[in-house]
Amino acid sequence: MQYALLGLGLSNKYAAKFLLKLGEKIFVSESGKLSSEDKAFLEENNIPYEEGVNSEKILEADVILTSPSVPHNHPILLKAQQMGKYVDTEITYFMKFLDWKPKIIAVTGSVGKSTTVAMINHLISKSASSQISGNFGIPIAQVLLEGKKPEYIVVEISSFQLYWTPFFKPNVAVITNIYPNHLDWHPSMEHYVDSKFKITKFQDNEDHFVYNPKDMETFKRLALVQAKRVPFTVDFKFEEIPFHIRTKQNMENIAAAKTVLKVLGLPFSMSMLEDFTPLPHRMEYCGTINGAHYYNDSKATNAAAVVKALENFDNNLYLIIAGKGKNEDYSKLANEISKKCKFVAIVGPISDAVEPYLKERNVNYKRFSNIEEAVFEISKMAKEGDYVLLGPAGASYDAYKNFEERGNHFKEIVKKLMQG
């Protein structure tokens, strides 16, 4: 069989390695630039490739595995679909090769999915073998190459990956919540929600669908779900959560993880999370300067995620919004800001989108040309008992490689200021 890999990110690199092992023919098409390391790998393995372009040579393949972020209306992929070619992404395509039949738990959602995946994996691993895969963790092709054969695979899957997949049937599907997100990629909110709901589209009544009963977008489509429907609810007190992960966001994340464990028939107790390592860039404490506490929430890349983060604060907050917006409505975020924030710093392209909402509500704000300037000015204003939050509400690509690089830069700035 002939394969074309559209984009050579981490998942398609492992796809290439696994397909080589099977002796399949591969062609790689990368619209950007390939690193010298990638070129060396392709040349060593006699894999033909092109860079700086996606040509019609892709259409010679029987199966096209695309990088998830490739636009949904990419002309080559539209043509491939018209020609009846099989288009998929690495994560769902290689599921069929998992011959030891592990249980697949798949998680999607606009906010909290990575933490929920990490918690589910942590809790399962107390009593069984488990591996995180997908968007976060290692690619499915890498799981196959490593040959460890875990009993459970916990997969984080995005709306992009779900949009591209022709078939995906996890044993347990989880939607944490659905808020407007990625509307710079999806042409409409409906397109986004339809993509999310593909997580349960091919499930039957042998499978389980774990959902948030408070989420309106999920609720509207519940009747379409063929799997056994299991709502997750917060049936514990905030104070019961281990202190190091005690945030408002984690109440729902823990409730979802606990429900998945119940569905799988595995043990759960809150004490099992005592040694859970929280993920960086999610309400991550960075330090205290002049009595003001600094938090890095660089992963909050949309308005809804920042609204969630604001639930942790009273009205003593300095907020930094930064990055590239996603074509969202900022009314709800601006309403929360007007109640909670003493001052808002806005940085980058998102400033133009957010500024009118802040002006309308008489919020005290100022534009800055970068995060460093914003933190420096805030450090002169924030006093004992105040909080400073990097809650970007936008993607990082305007100034950084990814949200991790942005969060690490923020942490470095805070560290420098702490050292005086």
Curated annotation (Swiss-Prot):
GO terms for biological process: cell division; cell wall organization; peptidoglycan biosynthetic process; regulation of cell shape. InterPro entries: Mur-like_cat_sf, Mur_ligase_C, Mur_ligase_C_dom_sf, Mur_ligase_cen, MurD. Gene3D superfamilies: Mur ligase, C-terminal domain (3.90.190.20), Mur-like, catalytic domain (3.40.1190.10), NAD(P)-binding Rossmann-like Domain (3.40.50.720). It is found in: Cytoplasm. GO terms for molecular function: ATP binding; UDP-N-acetylmuramoylalanine-D-glutamate ligase activity. One of its GO terms (cellular component) is cytoplasm. The keyword RNA-binding does not apply. ATP binds at G109, S110, V111, G112, K113, S114, T115. It catalyses: UDP-N-acetyl-alpha-D-muramoyl-L-alanine + D-glutamate + ATP = UDP-N-acetyl-alpha-D-muramoyl-L-alanyl-D-glutamate + ADP + phosphate + H(+). Transmembrane segments: none annotated. Pfam families: Mur_ligase_C, Mur_ligase_M, MurD_N. SUPFAM superfamilies: MurCD N-terminal domain, MurD-like peptide ligases, catalytic domain, MurD-like peptide ligases, peptide-binding domain. Pathway: Cell wall biogenesis; peptidoglycan biosynthesis. Keywords: ATP-binding, Cell cycle, Cell division, Cell shape, Cell wall biogenesis/degradation, Cytoplasm, Ligase, Nucleotide-binding, Peptidoglycan synthesis. Its EC number is 6.3.2.9. The keyword Ligase applies. It is an enzyme of class 6 (ligase). It comes from the Bacteria. Cell wall formation. Catalyzes the addition of glutamate to the nucleotide precursor UDP-N-acetylmuramoyl-L-alanine (UMA). PANTHER family: UDP-N-ACETYLMURAMOYLALANINE--D-GLUTAMATE LIGASE (PTHR43692:SF1). Belongs to the MurCDEF family. This is UDP-N-acetylmuramoylalanine--D-glutamate ligase. The lineage of its organism: Bacteria, Thermotogati, Thermotogota, Thermotogae, Thermotogales. The gene is murD.
